């Protein structure tokens, strides 16, 4: 999102591609996964992690993250059949509601989560992975915090958050972080999070 929609260099290449997919039930998820594999472009990475696929030619990893009808009341999902692996789905509905269409260099258009939604998902992932994959999420979150102002622009900030410019010691990065926090709060006030 930062690079293709806003021209912000992320300084590192992502290690995988995550696709959030709203599904009615596990049968729909299984059918989607099976269709991707049957299409010949993707292969399963392991039977233990059914959400992980790999693009055959590039070996680029693809994670399919279901949400919606597979979620439990606490907005988590437990992977069948044993339900020992649990994912937190907090932020997935919000990301879908706040998505933007982005055109990639190859001419492909797809809906991508807004930066406030990406930051919300990053915080959720950081919380989930804090004991197992340290140091992976904080640099991404810092990138969003530092560059959000540049991405949304002065007009958005001045129109919706004019008070941020009242400080005598205006700091661009601090204003960017505060602006992102406010826009995340609006996103979390959406009906899906109430």
Task: Describe each region flagged by the PLM.
Residues 1-194:
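Compositionally biased terminal segments of proteins
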């Amino acid at each position: 999102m930062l690079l293709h929609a806003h021209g912000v260099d992320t300084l590192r290449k992502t290690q995988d591609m995550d696709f959030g997919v709203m599904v009615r039930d596990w049968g729909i998820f299984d059918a989607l996964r099976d269709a991707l594999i049957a299409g010949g472009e993707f292969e399963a990475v392991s039977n233990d992690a059914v959400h992980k696929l790999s693009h055959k030619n590039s070996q680029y990893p693809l994670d399919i993250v279901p949400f919606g009808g597979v979620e439990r009341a606490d907005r988590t999902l437990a992977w069948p059949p044993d339900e020992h692996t649990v994912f937190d789905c907090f932020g997935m509905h919000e990301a879908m509601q706040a998505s933007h269409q982005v055109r990639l260099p190859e001419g492909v258009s797809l809906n991508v989560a807004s930066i406030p939604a990406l930051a919300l998902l990053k915080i959720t992932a950081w919380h989930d992975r804090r004991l197992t994959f340290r140091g992976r999420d904080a640099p991404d979150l810092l990138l969003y915090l530092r560059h959000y102002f540049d991405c949304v622009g002065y007009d958005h900030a001045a129109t919706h958050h004019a008070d941020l410019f009242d400080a005598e010691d205006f700091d661009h990065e601090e204003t960017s972080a505060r602006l992102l926090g406010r826009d995340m709060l609006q996103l979390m006030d959406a009906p899906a999070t109430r």
